[in-house]
Amino acid sequence: MAEKKKVEREFVEASTGKTGKGPAVVTAANKKSATGKRVAAVILWVLALAAEVGAILMLNGIWYIKEEQKMYWLIGALVVDLILVIIGSQLWKKANRLDPASKQSSVKFFLWNNMGLIASVICFLPIVILLLANKDLDGKTTKIVTVVAAIALVLASLFSIDFNPVSAEELAEAQQAVGTGTVYWTRFGKSYHLDPNCHTLMRSSKVYRGTIEEAFEANRTDPCDFCALEQE
C-alpha cells in the first residue's frame, strides 16, 4: 500500500483572507509569565526615568547638592538608571520570546521588539543633551559626567536591542514542525535540535531538553540544519 503523501496545510482567515501556517499556541502559563515580565519591565523603566529626573534636578540645582559632591551624586544616579534600564529590557525580551508579537501588525511588531531601545533613549538622551548645554558645572565635572552618561546610553542601547526578534509566525511554524515533541539545545549554541544524537551536540557535556516554547524562551529560535535534513 502506497504511503500517503503528507499535505502541507495552509490556514486562511475567513474575515481577512490572509494566509498562514496556523496560529502560535501560547499557553496560559506563558501568557501570564510574559505579562508579569512586561509589567515588571515597565515598572523598572519608570524607576529608571525617575533616576534620570533626579539627576536633572541635581544638575539644575533644584535638588541642592554641594558642588564638591555633585559629580558623585550625578554618576550614582546614572549608574542606577543604567542598571534599571538593562534589567527591564532583559525582562521585556524574555517576555517577547514567551508571547511574541505577530508580523501581521508591523507597527506593533516594531514597537514590541524595540521597547528596550526606546526606553534607553528616553532615560539617557535628555540628560546627555542637558549636560552638553550646561554652563554652571565646572569643566572637569561636566566632561566626566557627560562621558559617563554617553557610555551609559550606548551600553543601555546595546543590552536592550533584540538582535534576534521572534514573531508569532515563527513560533507557530516551529510548533507545527516539532509538535509536542522534545527539542534539545546547549548552553552556548544558537539552535534547537530535534535529534538528541545530532553530531553537533556530541561535544557538549551538558545538553538541555524541553518543549519548543522553552527553547524559544532560552533564545534558541533557529532549527538545526542537520536535524532538519534528517527529518526530511
Q: Which positions does each model-derived feature cover?
A:
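Membrane-interface helix-boundary motifs at transmembrane edges
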Residues: 64-69, 99-106, 135-143
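Cytosolic-side transmembrane helix boundary signature
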Residues: 108-109, 113-150
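Membrane-water interface of transmembrane alpha-helices
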Residues: 83-99
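Membrane-anchoring hydrophobic segments
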Residues: 1-86
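Juxtamembrane cytosolic interface motif at the C-terminal end of transmembrane helices
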Residues: 57-58, 89-93, 160
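Final/C-terminal transmembrane alpha-helix of multipass membrane proteins
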Residues: 146-161
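Mature, structured domains enriched in cysteine- and short glycine motifs
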Residues: 158-232
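Loop-to-transmembrane helix junctions at the membrane interface
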Residues: 71-74, 96-117
